[in-house]
């Protein structure tokens, strides 16, 4: 594990309790400029430095990753002054922690079958994050969950979905919110399985 002092004030206060969140499924939703993308990039970088975790970050369309998620992670690394700890592949954006070999890998869901051949250089994908999850299909999410099989059972695996508010007919609402009896005035929900 790499020791880098990142003050809690670096994070949006609302997300601080989720830095250590190990719930199996995690949902971050809010309007644009709510800070969810910045926080998730920060958390991905922290998890990479700690070692033992590889992150697969997806969006529906691969070419939209470069200007959004890849750039956000690069900004975090630069802002924290830790560029010397990472190698960033100029072709696909893959971020590798040079001290431990763990990676953040990026993939589009344009062709979900291609996901079957994506593997990190070391270990397995412990964390799968779907950015702008409202653009994805239920089947794509299920396929990504399958990518998290294997590796040590002691390492918690997480599936993180982030998106802007949705209508009640959307599959994300019917799959994750409706079964909970979600109220429109709720802002959080926490169980070991879902938060």
Each predicted region: which residue ranges?
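Phosphate/NTP-binding elements of NTP-utilizing enzymes
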Residues: 1-195
């Amino acid at each position: 594990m790499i020791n880098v002092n990142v003050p809690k004030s670096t994070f949006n206060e609302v997300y601080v309790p989720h830095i250590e969140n190990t719930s199996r499924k995690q949902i971050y939703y809010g309007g644009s400029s709510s800070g969810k993308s910045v926080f998730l990039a920060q958390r991905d970088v922290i998890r990479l430095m700690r070692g033992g975790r590889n992150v697969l970050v997806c969006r529906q369309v691969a070419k939209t990753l470069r200007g959004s998620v890849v750039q956000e992670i690069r900004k975090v690394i630069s802002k924290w002054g830790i560029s010397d700890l990472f190698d960033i592949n100029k072709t696909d954006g893959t971020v590798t922690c040079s001290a431990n070999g763990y990676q953040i890998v990026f993939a589009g869901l344009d062709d979900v079958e291609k996901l079957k051949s994506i593997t990190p250089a070391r270990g397995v994908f412990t964390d799968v994050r779907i950015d702008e999850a409202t653009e994805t299909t239920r089947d794509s999410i299920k396929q990504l969950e399958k990518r998290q099989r294997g590796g040590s059972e002691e390492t918690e695996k997480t599936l993180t979905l982030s998106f802007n508010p949705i209508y009640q007919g959307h599959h994300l609402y019917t799959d994750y919110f409706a079964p909970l009896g979600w109220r429109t005035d709720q802002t959080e929900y926490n169980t070991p399985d879902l938060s």
